[in-house]
UniProtKB/Swiss-Prot annotation:
It is found in: Endoplasmic reticulum lumen. Keywords: Calcium, Endoplasmic reticulum, Glycoprotein, Isomerase, Metal-binding, Repeat, Rotamase, Signal. Residues 1-23 form the signal peptide. GO terms for molecular function: calcium ion binding; peptidyl-prolyl cis-trans isomerase activity. It comes from the Eukaryota. It is an enzyme of class 5 (isomerase). It comes from Pongo abelii (Sumatran orangutan). The keyword Isomerase applies. Glycosylated. This is Peptidyl-prolyl cis-trans isomerase FKBP7. The keyword Transcription does not apply. One of its GO terms (cellular component) is endoplasmic reticulum lumen.
């Protein structure tokens, strides 16, 4: 084999093996990275835990692991009302979807989320969350209800069977769900939740949520 061809062959083999080594190392790193969960408080009575597709109501604070600086606080948004979101459908970062699975209403957790389950190499919010940042969240879960996106639930809310959800119908549904939760909430809280639902889902602004609008999951920033 001519020297030039021999060198080229060795060159190709080297980079092929290097590529395999790099890919295996990346897979190993992905396997070793995981969301770490510390349960700070768990109620003694827990008849229902959160699962994919459930509608959750929670507050959470976010910190950068490297220096402990706070970058997010849900209590500073929506007049301090807890956030509503559906678990496991990408409305929050993947790490939070994992961290909030199998939680009881009233449970508190502290979780550590590696970059691969957060914002990765890109970072977020114009440098507020830098690239490759490990994040810490302190979470308090208030309520777990059946996810609102199933056909069955749509039919339950749609009392007059006109295939659209009015504010009155959704308001009644929320009232029933809050009563099941057995935690006192004033009318202003329920009104705020109702307003938020229509703000995120009534895309054509007609005052109703259609089946199409109902089945569109919104992606929140955090």
């Amino acid at each position: 084999m001519p020297k030039t061809m021999h060198f080229l062959f060795r060159f190709i083999v080297f980079f092929y093996l290097w590529g395999l080594f790099t890919a295996q190392r990346q897979k190993k790193e992905e396997r070793t990275e995981e969301v770490k969960i510390e349960v700070l408080h768990r109620p003694e009575n827990c008849s229902k835990t959160s699962k994919k597709g459930d509608l959750l109501n929670a507050h959470y604070d976010g910190y950068l692991a490297k220096d402990g600086s706070k970058f997010y606080c849900s209590r500073t948004q929506n007049e301090g009302h807890p956030k509503w979101f559906v678990l496991g459908v990408g409305q929050v970062i993947k790490g939070l979807d994992i961290a909030m699975t199998d939680m009881c209403p009233g449970e508190k957790r502290k979780v550590v989320i590696p970059p691969s389950f957060a914002y990765g190499k890109e970072g977020y919010a114009e440098g507020k969350i830098p690239p490759d940042a490990t994040l810490i969240f302190e979470i308090e879960l208030y309520a777990v209800t059946k996810g609102p996106r199933s056909t069955e639930t749509f039919k339950q809310i749609d009392m007059d069977s006109d295939r659209q959800l009015s504010k009155a119908e959704i308001n009644l549904y929320l009232q029933r769900e809050f009563e099941k939760d057995e935690k006192p909430r004033d009318k202003s809280y329920q009104d705020a939740v109702l307003e938020d639902i229509f703000k995120k889902n009534d895309h054509d602004g007609d005052g109703f949520i259609s089946p199409k609008e109902y089945n569109v999951y919104q992606h929140d920033e955090l």
